[in-house]
Amino acid sequence: AATESAVVTIGALQAGTKDNVIPDDALLRINVRTFDTAVRTRVLDAITRIVKAEADASGAPTPPTITTTEHYPLLRNDPSWSARLAGAIRKQLGDDRVHELAAPISASEDFGSFGTEWGVPSVFWYVGGTDPDLYRTAEQAGRVAQDVPTNHNPRFAPVIHPTLETGVQAMIAAVLDALESGLR
């Protein structure tokens, strides 16, 4: 269904070392992001099916080796803790500095492991760190998505100050709120 999105990124393709020698093998590094485990399974199965079919169609002498190197649980924020901590962070930083996302982002992130492994609620948030002039210019041009580099982009370069201070203030607000609540 159209609501079951998936992102498949080919992060690296490595084959051979010389322009005039046909390599024996190739390495394809793929990242898959989904919001649903059933969708994730279908996507991974499709990748396996396609890779095996392409190897077979090309007459490869051996079947491809497919290895999962990293696999993390889906990152799902606990709704009640998200609302609670957003309130605590707003109180600390001000309403104008806390923005809730309208829709989930398919981040490639291992943070989901913490709540899943320990069986506790977890909340993941972003701290904006873009140079204010760069952001303002991109926003005025209606090009934030195109011109503002995000995590994992080679041009991503957060401004250290006040980003670090803001992140620490947000974390302190969240921790104090959680401790004051008795972690209920």
PLM features: residue spans?
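Metal-dependent amide/peptide-bond hydrolase catalytic core
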Residues: 1-184
